[in-house]
Amino acid sequence: MNVVIVGAGVAGVNAATKLVDNNFKGKITIIDMGLDPYNRPTSDVMRGFLGAGGWSDGKLTYHTSIGGQLSKYCGEDKAMELFDQVIDNFKRFHPNPSEVQCSDPQAEPDFIKPHFGLRLFPVWHVGTDYLHEIGKNWYDYLVDKGVEFVWETKVHAIDFENCRVLGKSLVGDIHTEDRYDKLIFGVGKSGIDFGKQLAEEYNLPTEPKSVQIGVRFEAPQQHFQKLIDISYDFKLYQKFEDKGVSLRTFCTNNNAAYVAAEHTYGDVSYNG
């Protein structure tokens, strides 16, 4: 049996890991527009092994109360079980698992109650520099298990009738064709246009996501230290029912050391 996975982000990599951990005997091929963790440039923050998370600061915020709609399709308990498996894999390939930190707030502190709510769930931090080593260890494990990677290749069509994935190299005039018995579609942000193309071509049902507008706010860390001591990546929120909108904080970057440039559709933005 041939399994083809489109996308080497967290979804695709964990899918391949699940297969090999369960002694899958067929062929596994992962196709991605980026590169492996040894050769992926820091400028490519979206594509390559582990996807957008590969060049992040190493925070893991997997919970049904924030982002995503996985629980809608498989239920709350199953979603949390899958999230735990992902977190376990990041710890499993960590070169020094004892260094993994977790902040798990148990109650909202009184000093914010008049103003905001605080999401109560654990946030794991594997370490910014360690994250690169995790990626290498994880990649080596999959390669040792026989997983094949096709890098710098953009999938431009999927022939469902004949079970073919059609791609083209981004570095040369090379066209690829991979036949599959099972297909896992795991593209992320950099493949969203292709996902939309497939949905329109095959009349797949879709639903719009809510619009989120982000504002970067910087302030001295001491202003937030009491919150940071409770939750490293604190998630404050407030709903304005009369206006039909809500406000939340996300991806706090305490005592930041790195800033990465992100190139999307010709625009350049940055992350702390």
Predicted regions and their residues:
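Residues forming the flavin
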Residues: 1-64, 104-272
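Rossmann-like flavin
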Residues: 66-67, 71-126
